Amino acid sequence: PGDIWDAVSNLLILYRHVPSVIAGPVYIGHIDRLLDPFVKDEEEARHAIRIFLTHVDRTISDSFCHADIGPYDTKAGRIILELSAQMQRPVPNMSLIYNEHTTDEFACKAIETGLVTAKPSFVNDAMYTADWGREYAIVSCYNALPIGGGGLTLGRLNMKKLGDVAESREHFLDHLLPAAVAAQCEQMDKRDTYILEQGRFL
């Protein structure tokens, strides 16, 4: 991309072509890192990022969609926090990767934003890095997945429905839950087989 407009346009085009369990990507990236190199004029960047966030909210109509920011204090990150507080849109959901590199000022800005719009959530980077290594992302609440793949296995299971039809605790644990888990695993395998082997998306 040559400028901030190219950057947001390219991301929005890319999001339309990601296979997903929702109407768009589950994870839209560390958006501050993706956009910060193109923030030259802050007012122009604010305008472009506002359009970007509005487009994501209006076209990926599912709060399963998630963005990460941080840990570093960037111009793009500050603009994203400022606009999130102003716009108060539910999508994308957002997390701040928090570690020793996160400045107090940036963390406080995130807290102020969270008090207005209930995002971003704070992520203990040290804990997730211990489990996943450096190349992870937080997607859809607190699910961690490796960057570059893994969202294919995200599915939804309505546990309440299982409870509603359970005849007893034993029926739930011994029959319904194992059958539901087996169905989820089969669905994941079929999705992965189609996208990775038959559809050749990646």
Question: What spans do the regions from the language model cover?
Answer:
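Conserved catalytic cores of very large enzyme subunits
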Residues: 1-202
